[in-house]
Every structure is written in structure tokens, then in C-alpha cells.
Amino acid sequence: MISMSVPRKKQEREISLLMHYVDDVFPHQFPIYHSQFVGKREWLLPLLSSTRSVYYATLCLSLLHKEKSSNLDQPGSVSFCQEERLRYYILALRETQQLLQQLSPVCDLEAMRSCVPSLASALHLISYESSCPVYGDWKVHLQAATSLIPILVGGWNSMIKPIKHTSTLWTGLTLSDFHDLHTEGSLSYEDASALRFLTNALAVTGILSFISTGPTSALSDYRYLMDATCDMVQCDQFLGCENWVMSAILDVGLLDRWKREEEGNRRLSFRELANRAKRLEDCLENGIRELSAKTSGSSDAVSSITRIYASSTLTYLHSVVSGLNPDLSEIQESVSRTIELLKELSNWHLLACLTWPLCVTGCMAAPDHEAFFHSLAISAEISPHSLRHTWIVLRILKDVGKVRGSLGEQILPTWEQILCIDGAPILLT
């Protein structure tokens, strides 16, 4: 726990901001994460007050949420809030950089203990930088978080016993599954719970970011994370989308990277491209059929979200293979399927978890579907005052419509060119 000597009034205000994060910001950021999962939120407050880096990053994010959600109609109030937010941000940035610089590359207990607040701070700064009106360089913080993947994977697999049971780690892990948790020579239960959650947050953020940044070399890091963590990553309990679809999104990104590299070397084989794409398409189609058969007539949130992500991933796949051409029959088919699934949603608030598929589908949809996406925004009460990025989809769709009009019959540019506002890439989380 951090120890700081600050005036009482300031201390009270900072504690109030911490509780605002716990009560309002955290549920808003992660609406699918429920208290029945292992660890509940018992790890959250200890984490937020564990180091100066996490503490300050939480305060600046909490202030940003207050600023966006409150009616600060007095210029003085707005100015004070912004100044405080910027001050905490600078402190968080400095402390996080120091923490990362001190982190040992050796995967031992001390590195794991330091890795938890380092990752938490980086993820907070990503949320802060990627939100309106900040729109800063969230990519540098994601790069820092991605560099922690080897420590996360190595530490998790070495410090948690191999567990064989029918349920997932998040729903089946108990204290007896840890090595000597009562001693100082082991990872605490709170740290282990935070580690699970933060690793899932990193996996989801990283995988969904590549459509905005382009298929970088970091794709391989996330493939390693998904394959090597022995069920630690459970995206359905974090985002509502099952792992197999998140892996498919990752594989489409890897296909995009391979295609661009082959094109750059003037050796792209269209037959090989078609074969690779067909394997991904078959995997997605089979997964959708199996899920639909298991959940026929069900309004379960995870199955609904997973099918929407899977269907929109097909659109993403077709756009990578054939270009961003909304007139292609295969793109029209997957777009229509996704729109039908969106219409079947029984809970409009689930749209908060669907920024990525909404954007992919909306950008490739026919112009006559524009009214449908606006009606979704109204139904879900999507607002620019939110820390989530669902509302920005509407602006992107409007910009894409303008680009289409100017290009005529030409296809749209790359995804990373589309998903950019005022020179900053938009994170679709």
C-alpha cells in the first residue's frame, strides 16, 4: 500500500475519487464482468492503492469520467477539473515509467508482483488516452503493456498449479490451487486475481486494437498469450465474446500481415491467400453453427455477443482478402447476418460491449442501413459523455459515408486509415 502525507481535505477528495472509480467507472468500463467470478472485486481496491502509478492513473481516469458525465457549466469548475486531471496524469505517467524501468526481465516472484501494478497503470493510461476529449497516444501505453506478456505467461504457468477440472479458472479456482498463499514467498490471492483480470483486459484490448493500428509484429505476442496461458484468458467473462472468436480476429490480423508482407515482396499467391482465408471462414462458420445449435431460442448475453462478433469477423476477413468493398456479395451477406443478430438483441445495453463489430459492420453496410445504426445509438442511450467508445462509431460511419461519396466506384482505403480521427487512431473497445 502507498504511504503519502497529504492535507486531510485533499486526502478525502482522492479517496472519494477512488470510490467513484470503484462504484461508477469500473462497472461502466467492464459491464460484463460480474461479482460471482472468482476474486469478485475483492482485489480491486488493494490494487488501486498498491502503488503511486496505479493510484494516480485511477484518479485521472476517475476525474475524466466525472468531467464527461457531470454538468460542469461553470468555466471555473471545468478549468479546475481539467487542471487536476492533467496533474494526476503527469504524476501517473512519471510513476508508471519508473515502475516499468525497474521491472526485472527475469520471471520470478518479485517480477510478477511488480508486473501487476505496471499492467494496471498501463491499461488505465490506455483508457485515458483513447477517450474523448484527450485522444492522445494510447499506442505507446499498449506497447508497454504488450512487453509484459512474457512475464505474465511465464509467471502464471510457474506459480499456479496445473488445474484439471470441468469449469474455467475464473469460476473454479480456489485458494488451495495456489502454492503456499499464506507465505511471503508466494503470490497473494489479491495479486493473482488482479493478474487474471488484467491479463484478460490486455488480451481484449490488444486483439481489438490491430484493426485500428494495422497488423503489426505484436500480433505474434498476442497469439502467444492466447495459446500459452492455460485457460487464464477467458474473454467471455470479460467482454462477453468467447475465446475462439477472439482467436479468429487475431488470425485474420495475422493473415492481413502475411498478405501485406507478400505483396511488398511481390510474391503474393492468390491461391495460398484463398486457402488460408477458407480455413478461417470454415472455422467461423462451424463455430457459429455449433453455438446456434446449443443456444437456439436463448437470449444469453454471451451467446448473443459471441455470434455478433463471429459474424462481423467474417466481414473483417472478407475485407482483408478482397479489400474494403461493401458491394461484394460475401461482405453484404455477413453484414446482413450481423444486422439481423443486432435486431434480435433483447438487452440494448449489451451494445456497450459491441463497439468493434458495430464499427466493422457499419462501415461495410449499405447506405440505407445508416438509419438503423442511429436508432441503435438512441435505443442504447449511447452518449459522447461515456468513457466507452461505442458512440464514436456514429462519427466514423458518417466519415466513411463521405469518403464513399468522394471515391465513387473505388474501394475504401485500409481500416487504419478509416479508423482515425484528427490524426489519432480510434480504439474500438
From Swiss-Prot:
GO terms for cellular component: nucleus. GO terms for biological process: positive regulation of transcription by RNA polymerase II. GO terms for molecular function: DNA-binding transcription factor activity; transcription cis-regulatory region binding. Coiled coil: none annotated. It is found in: Nucleus. Pfam families: Fungal_trans_2 (PF11951). The keyword Cell membrane does not apply. Keywords: Nucleus, Transcription, Transcription regulation. InterPro entries: Fun_TF. The keyword Transcription applies. Disruption phenotype: Reduces markedly the expression of hepA and abolishes the production of heptelidic acid. It comes from the Eukaryota. Its main location: nucleus. PANTHER family: TRANSCRIPTION FACTOR, PUTATIVE-RELATED, TRANSCRIPTIONAL ACTIVATOR PROTEIN UGA3. Transcription factor; part of the gene cluster that mediates the biosynthesis of heptelidic acid (HA), a sesquiterpene lactone that acts as an inhibitor of glyceraldehyde-3-phosphatedehydrogenase (GAPDH) and a growth inhibitor of the salt-tolerant lactic acid bacteria in soy sauce brewing. Both hepR and hepS regulate the transcription of the heptelidic acid cluster, but they are not involved in mutual transcriptional regulation and act with different mechanisms. Belongs to the TRI10 transcription regulator family. This is Transcription factor hepS. It comes from Aspergillus oryzae (strain ATCC 42149 / RIB 40). The gene is hepS.
